[in-house]
From Swiss-Prot:
Transmembrane segments: none
NCBIfam families: fliE
HAMAP family (UniProt xref): FliE
Protein name as it appears in the record: Flagellar hook-basal body complex protein FliE
Amino acid sequence: MSNSVDTQSLMLQMRSLAAEAASQSQSVQKVEKGAQSAENFSDLLSQSVNAVATEQNKSSAMKTAFEKGEDVDLTEVMVQAQKASLSFQAMTQVRNKLVEAYKDIKNMPI
C-alpha cells in the first residue's frame, strides 16, 4: 500500500516538473517573440515616419509644380496637401501617446 502512494507521489512530482519545464520553455519563447516584436515595432515606426516624409515631399513637389504653372490640377494639389497634413497630425498624436505612456511607466512605483 505504501508502494502505491510512493508511485502516485512520484507521478505527481514528475507531472509538476514537466509542467514547470513546459512553462519555462514557453516563457523563453515569449521573450524571444518579444524581442522580435520590438524589432518589428521599430521597423514599423520607421516605415511610418518615412511614409509621412514621403507624403510631405510629394505635397511640396506638387505645390511647387503648380506654382511654376506646370500641368498639375489644383484639386490634386489640395488633396495631396490634406493627405500630408493628416498623416503628419496622426504621427504627432502617436508620438504624444508614446511619450505619455513612457512618462506613465517612468512614474510607476516599484
